[in-house]
From Swiss-Prot:
Broadest EC class assigned to this enzyme: ligase
The family this protein is said to belong to: Belongs to the ATP-dependent AMP-binding enzyme family.
Region called Disordered, residue ranges: 1-35
Protein name per its UniProtKB record: Acetyl-coenzyme A synthetase
Cofactor(s) annotated in UniProt: Mg(2+)
CDD domains with a match to the protein in the record: ACS (cd05966)
Function: Catalyzes the conversion of acetate into acetyl-CoA (AcCoA), an essential intermediate at the junction of anabolic and catabolic pathways. AcsA undergoes a two-step reaction. In the first half reaction, AcsA combines acetate with ATP to form acetyl-adenylate (AcAMP) intermediate. In the second half reaction, it can then transfer the acetyl group from AcAMP to the sulfhydryl group of CoA, forming the product AcCoA.
GO cellular component: cytosol
Length: 659
């Protein structure tokens, strides 16, 4: 890494001061077998899609089953899109029925492993049968197309069955992460006006069981729309079943036949709601619709993961988040892939659970989060190196930008320097991957998502909307509609327009800062909320974090700002150390000098606090908002509903920097 000065940068730009010069071409053995095998092929595909997007997306859509073909590929009345308008289809039919009619009927769709080691395999034929049966259960319960269904379960195959059954009958699923508390469920159920809640009695996590049904009972005291609760027996928790309201999954499945005609729904028929936290106020119900989401989920999965019929693909996300929706359920099943699904924690019973899984199940593709990778680094290399990971051929990351040093560790120890890494950028709102290497074509650099997918028109712009120069930090926007884009924030079009479309008229604003390097690769610099003005320089805190993590003593770091009378803002770093290192004044000084050397004196933290752990959401993202509050006042006033471990906050209060 080295510092670089950006020329011709406007005062409205975000300073980009971190440069990465390491580059890794795709292995020849991988490229020769991949769907997109050269940059020339990628460039042509990208240019063709840019020149005629209707043809590009229309050709992809032709690969699916339609009950009635669309009249037009896109009707765009900014900021509202209608994709494949006039067509009718069913995404569950395309996930299951098309495969059941082929040799894939007996192919494994889901290989599931419970935290306790128990295993289940569902073939496409068996998954189709179970989904059809549960779709009939929903019909028995009075669910009609357009009705909302809330789902609150751990990572068990029945969660996939419930989701696809909703899609089969045209109901709108609203999956709520099984780590959320009662209040969060109440909010989401009431906002969506769900008629039914599907839950498990309990779930397993790190050797313990959590009673989910009791949480649901508390949540639905104030949810007048809920008429029925369907309960799946998973852990055998002691629960109370309310007469007339609560019904056992297995009892209802016993009443249902195993054939169910799919609802023929309009292309723009709502498919699901997924709630994402706003910086303030109530959660946003992101609405995705059927056909456009189907086309992009399937095509992005095929090309980014270079999927083959013999692959066993392991995505470590939870289905309660968008990654689980698109890249555990819909993307893989639309492609007839085999998905490995794991119930529990990555460090139970020990830190090598994932590596043991990869070895035993011969996983070929691993898609995980930088947060997990940093935790594995901290745990020690020996947990990885004692397992045979030779089955892996491709690695992926998702959820946040990956620090270059974490990328290098992933490449060396997990990929054994032979697996391409697809560092993917996308959002709940985008529905699918937007920026990513093509693993058989794109030379990768540690820490960048590289180039946009064909058909995706992104740019980095200044505050006035004009394109930035190379290496000039700016704002990441999408300049054209894409099929899997969110259609609105449910029940709040005004908030949708203001949040995503008001900052740069005619362009979707992602909320992220970014820069393009000399190769046109896009570097995500973090949320614009995390851009700090220090002595007139606007710095992306993710670059300061990357510099800190490149120090040999640092496992993880988060950098935020607090007001400063002289500088405007001061940088405060919360640092988690690797085992064997002591947080003291000498190391604090060493870290400051290291950042100054890597980036420049302007980026040197004014304050460094030692942290045993960082506050994270239940999906593993660092809650920088809480750290900003701690840095400013050492108190937390905001919402902590999505915080995974409240004990982390108390520890950070106690660890307030002595100077």
């Amino acid at each position: 890494m080295a510092t670089e000065q950006t020329k011709g940068q406007s005062s409205e730009s975000i300073s980009s001061v971190l440069s990465e010069r390491r580059k890794f071409p795709p292995p020849e053995a991988f490229s020769s077998q991949s769907h997109i095998s050269s940059m020339e092929q990628y460039e042509k595909l990208y240019a063709d899609a840019a020149a005629d997007p209707d043809k590009y997306w229309g050709d992809l859509a032709e690969q699916f089953h339609w009950f009635k073909k669309w009249d037009s590929v896109l009707e765009w009345n900014a900021p509202y899109a209608k994709w494949f308008n006039g067509g009718t289809t069913n995404i569950a039919y395309n996930c299951l029925d098309v495969h059941v009619g082929s040799w894939r009927k007996n192919k494994a769709a889901i290989i599931w492993e419970g935290e306790e080691g128990n295993e289940r395999i569902l073939t496409y034929g068996e998954l189709h049968r179970q989904v059809s049966k549960f779709a009939n259960v929903l019909k028995i319960a009075g669910i009609k197309p357009g009705d909302k269904v809330a789902i609150y379960m751990g990572m068990v195959p029945e969660l996939v069955i419930a989701v696809l059954a909703c899609a089969r009958v045209g109901a709108v699923h609203n999956v709520i992460f099984a780590g959320f508390a009662a209040h969060a469920i109440t909010e989401r159920v009431n906002d969506s006006r769900a008629k039914i809640v599907i839950c498990a009695d309990g779930t397993r996590r790190r050797g313990s069981t959590i009673n989910l049904k009791n949480i649901v009972d508390e949540a639905i005291i104030n949810t007048p729309s809920v008429k029925n609760v369907i309960v799946l027996k998973v852990t055998g928790e002691e629960i109370h079943m309310h007469d007339g309201m609560d019904h056992w999954w297995h009892d209802l499945m016993g009443l249902a036949v195993d054939e169910c005609e799919p609802a023929q729904v309009d292309s723009e028929h709502p498919l699901f709601l997924l709630y994402t936290s706003g910086s303030t106020g109530k959660p946003k119900g992101i609405l995705h619709t059927t056909a456009g989401y189907m086309v992009h989920a399937a095509s992005s999965f095929k090309y980014v993961f270079d999927i083959k019929d013999e692959d066993i693909y392991f995505c470590t996300a939870d289905i309660g988040w968008i990654t689980g929706h698109t890249y555990i359920i819909y993307g893989p099943l639309l492609n007839g892939a085999t998905v490995f699904m794991y119930e529990g924690a990555p460090n139970y019973p020990q830190w090598d659970r994932f590596w043991d899984i990869i070895n035993r199940h011969k996983i070929t593709i691993l898609y995980t989060a930088p947060t997990a990778i940093r935790a594995f680094i901290r745990a020690g290399n020996e947990w990885v190196t004692k397992h045979d990971l030779s089955s892996l051929r491709l690695l992926g990351t998702v959820g946040e930008p990956i620090n270059p040093e974490a990328w290098m560790w992933y490449h060396k120890y997990v990929g054994q320097e032979k697996c391409p890494i697809v560092d993917t950028w996308w959002q709940t709102e985008t529905g699918g991957i937007m920026i990513s290497p093509m693993p058989g074509a794109t030379p990768t650099k540690p820490g960048t998502a590289t180039r946009p997918l064909p058909g995706i028109m992104v740019d980095v712009v200044r505050k006035d909307g004009t394109p930035c120069n190379a290496n000039e930090g700016g704002y990441l926007v999408v300049k054209r509609p894409w099929p899997s884009m969110l259609r609105t924030i449910y029940g709040d079009n005004e908030r949708y327009e203001k949040t995503y479309w008001s900052e740069f008229p005619g362009m979707y604003f992602t909320g992220d800062g970014a820069r393009k390097d000399d190769d046109g690769y896009i570097w995500i610099m973090g949320r614009v909320d995390d851009v700090v003005n220090v002595s007139g320089h606007r710095l992306g805190t993710s670059e300061v974090e990357s510099a800190l993590v490149s120090h040999e003593a640092v496992a993880e770091a988060a950098v935020v700002s607090r007001p400063d009378e002289i500088k405007g803002n001061a940088l405060v770093a919360f640092v988690t150390l690797k085992d064997g290192y002591e947080g003291d004044a000498k190391l604090r000084d060493s870290l400051g000098k290291h950042v100054a050397k890597e980036i420049g004196a302007i980026a040197k933290p004014d304050e460094i606090r030692w942290a045993k752990g960082l506050p994270k959401t239940r999906s593993g993202k660092i809650m920088r908002r809480l750290l900003r509050e701690l840095a400013t006042s050492n108190e937390i006033k905001g919402d902590v509903t999505t915080l995974e471990d409240l004990g982390v906050i108390e520890n950070l209060r106690e660890q307030e920097d002595e100077g």
